[in-house]
A protein has these predicted regions:
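Phosphate-binding site of ATP-dependent enzymes
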Residues: 30-120
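A short glycine-rich, hydrophobically flanked beta-strand micro-motif that places a catalytic Asp/Glu
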Residues: 56, 67, 122-134
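Anionic group-transfer/hydrolysis microenvironments
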Residues: 22, 61-62, 70, 128-130, ...
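Protein kinase-like catalytic core scaffold
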Residues: 17, 77-78, 125, 138-141
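Residue-level signal for tight coil/turn positions that link beta-strands
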Residues: 14, 73-74, 134
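A conserved helix-loop-beta module that forms one wall/lid of the active-site cleft
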Residues: 1-32
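Short beta->alpha connector loops
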Residues: 3-8, 61-64, 123
Length: 165
């Protein structure tokens, strides 16, 4: 669902979309901006330009259930939960609304997440996926060494095992 990934020629983007600052990790709510209209998109781009953001991506918005996941590549550990059950960093979860409980295969998400972890050399990871009504999913975020706060005790054993491997 990647739409663009440079500061050139952003006038042909279609909303709704998410504009994400790639110069650094998301520190403020303005580093990841939901744009439901072209006007909001233009405002978000002006915000990035004023802040000197040079590298960004625009992702098309996907409707569905927002799932947070945590994993440790090379182990059996994988935890997921609906975004509404955990801590909200900036409140962007509200865009997709209340989860509908769409069915999906967590093992399949784990397999793909482990492949990304291997390619990126990020064995201790977390992220977000959107699940649609058919059970299809889109990775929308992938992080190295997230907090694991919602599953800390179970994760600690897998993290320790992975570190000594």
């Amino acid at each position: 669902n990647l739409v663009k990934s440079s500061v050139e020629n952003y006038t042909d983007l279609t909303t709704p979309l998410w504009l994400k600052n790639c110069d650094s990790s998301a520190i403020t709510a303005d580093d990841t901006i939901f744009c439901s209209t072209e006007e909001e998109g233009n405002k978000a781009f002006r915000n990035f330009e004023e802040r000197g953001v040079e590298t960004w991506i625009a992702q098309s918005h996907q409707n569905g259930d927002l799932i947070k996941f945590y994993g440790v590549e090379g182990t059996d550990f994988f935890h997921w939960n609906y975004a509404s059950l955990g801590h909200s960093k900036f409140g962007h979860e509200k865009v997709n609304g209340k989860e509908k409980g769409y069915q999906f295969c967590a093992d399949k998400i784990k397999r793909y997440a482990d492949k990304m972890a291997q390619k990126l050399n990020v064995p201790i990871y977390g992220g977000d996926v959107i699940i649609d009504e058919k059970g299809d999913f889109w990775f929308i975020d992938f992080n190295d060494f997230p907090s694991f706060s919602i599953c800390r005790e179970k994760a600690a054993k897998a993290i320790a095992l992975r570190i000594v491997q």
